[in-house]
Amino acid sequence: MKKKANEEKAQKRAKTEAKAEATQENKTKENNKAKESKIKESKIKEAKAKEPIPVKKLSFNEALEELFANSLSDCVSYESIIQISAKVPTLAQIKKIKELCQKYQKKLVSSSEYAKKLNAIDKIKKTEEKQKVLDEELEDGYDFLKEKDFLEWSRSDSPVRMYLREMGDIKLLSKDEEIELSKQIRLGEDIILDAICSVPYLIDFIYAYKDALINRERRVKELFRSFDDDDENSVSDSKKDEDNEEDEENEERKKVVSEKDKKRVEKVQESFKALDKAKKEWLKALEAPIDEREDELVRSLTLAYKRQTLKDRLYDLEPTSKLINELVKTMETTLKSGDGFEKELKRLEYKLPLFNDTLIANHKKILANITNMTKEDIIAQVPEATMVSVYMDLKKLFLTKEASEEGFDLAPNKLKEILEQIKRGKLISDRAKNKMAKSNLRLVVSIAKRFTSRGLPFLDLIQEGNIGLMKAVDKFEHEKGFKFSTYATWWIKQAISRAIADQARTIRIPIHMIDTINRINKVMRKHIQENGKEPDLEVVAEEVGLSLDKVKNVIKVTKEPISLETPVGNDDDGKFGDFVEDKNIVSSIDHIMREDLKAQIESVLDQLNEREKAVIRMRFGLLDDESDRTLEEIGKELNVTRERVRQIESSAIKKLRSPQYGRILRNYLRI
């Protein structure tokens, strides 16, 4: 009976447990479904948020009306009209443009004239703002509280603290503000490119990079985005010296690389061909005879369209900020009154190893005819291959100087307008770049803190990080949807780590070697933490994937040099250099032995007669000049024949070989 009762209880318990498990499973399923539905809803919301808000596309007339209504000055540029129409306007559209000019009292001008007008407006605004600030200061009088704050601020003599205090006053940017600043940078560069397209010489200047791009020369690596290799490839270049094993690649991979390179070369050639064609069409339209029957507005808009096409072809090459700055610098350097050209010439000449008269004479000879020389001519005349790129830059400088003397084939007024346009573009882009860089200085400091105690002072780390930040500002593309700080972090880290690799050690180690050192150190730290002792080098070599000899060499490289001025002892009265053996100085024991040997030789020679003694001394270099003389030289000094000298020498040596004297000198044979 008891058994039956126990069995029934067990069955009931099992049923209740099964029910509980089933209900629990149902609950978890419901919870999972609820979670999945929430995730789906959130994803749908995110997708909707990311979807661009549909913008109503304006018609040509509406866009034109908006352009005239929102113009900042009493002018509208031909180029802005072409950007709306994307082609030469029709007669009906030209009629509409004329109507809007009368309605809004606007004048149609070129983009360079428009930039000049805007520069004048900005100048007036700037002077008004300055005057307003001065007036406010005069009204407020002298503020003693501000002076007190300034004194407290200036008490800290630490440059780091002063820098951090100033940096803290700058506000951080939102994502929308970053996008707006990025657009401002692009706008400034667009204005500069528009000005560049007005100077045929500068288009030829860009065209000269064609061969360098095809040959993948390092000097043009950062000038064009579309053909710019990743920085990782630059690291792979340094790895070429590491091992012969790494040079062996798969045949398939080689084929892929060659195909890729072939496509790249084709792309370069097509892009430059299109640029050359657009330039020729623009020059043809520019040089075409003016037809009096043709409407002046139609001609101006046609020229603007041709120039816009040229600019679009230039944009296809995706020039970087560095190239734009180089073009502007080239133009400004040669047009500067005074020593602008001479300064640039000296800067380039400083890179050349002109350390003797022959090289200087050769340099002057090359400069005398550099504008007519090809690259092959320069290679034939310079002693080092590294000098070729400098001479090519010198050639560009001289050609630009010649072009500038002729006003770049432009009227003086037109040249001034173009320079004003460049000035405006630089002002817009520089202002936006400075604001973006200043707003992210805190990011540099936060990253630099992680690299302290690596051999560089904190301020140096901040400065190197700032260089990386400026590169990030130049290369940032807001269209990809990333925040600037996310993109800039990589550049800042890369700049700091590169600086540590180059400057932190007394003896510089290549970057690829530092990567290997870090891998070995990581493995060794791991083993010390796990086993409490350093691992065998065989184990390290196996885990790192290198040979034992390679690991030994890397560990040797990691040893830091010790300064000879390092203090030794508790009282700091000695230096490490005092304990290093000088191999050039004779040891005291050797000195005593040598002096004793000289004395013994003198005592032995005293047993010979005067003539024998003189012959032995001269023959074996025992005089003060320590030079061995020939038999003939000794004979001349003693007024005897060569044969007689030989006889005297042999008789003297015979005497010295006797056991009586030989026993004395035998102990000195090791000296």
UniProtKB/Swiss-Prot annotation:
Protein name: RNA polymerase sigma factor RpoD
Family indicated by similarity: Belongs to the sigma-70 factor family. RpoD/SigA subfamily.
This protein's encoding gene: rpoD
Biased composition (Basic and acidic residues): 251-260
Function: Sigma factors are initiation factors that promote the attachment of RNA polymerase to specific initiation sites and are then released. This sigma factor is the primary sigma factor during exponential growth.
Key words, A-Z: Cytoplasm, DNA-binding, Sigma factor, Transcription, Transcription regulation
Motif (Interaction with polymerase core subunit RpoC): 460-463
Disordered: annotated segments: 1-45, 229-260
One cellular-component annotation, GO: cytoplasm
Locations listed in the record: Cytoplasm
Domain of life the protein comes from: Bacteria
Region described as Sigma-70 factor domain-4: 604-658
Positions of the UniProt region annotated as Sigma-70 factor domain-2: 436-506
DNA-binding segment(s): 631-650
UniProt main location, coarse: cytoplasm
Pfam families noted in UniProt: Sigma70_r1_2 (PF00140), Sigma70_r2 (PF04542), Sigma70_r3 (PF04539), Sigma70_r4 (PF04545)
Subunit record text: Interacts transiently with the RNA polymerase catalytic core.
Example GO molecular function: sigma factor activity
PANTHER family on file: RNA POLYMERASE SIGMA FACTOR RPO, RNA POLYMERASE SIGMA FACTOR RPOD
Region (Sigma-70 factor domain-3): 515-591
GO BP: any one term: DNA-templated transcription initiation
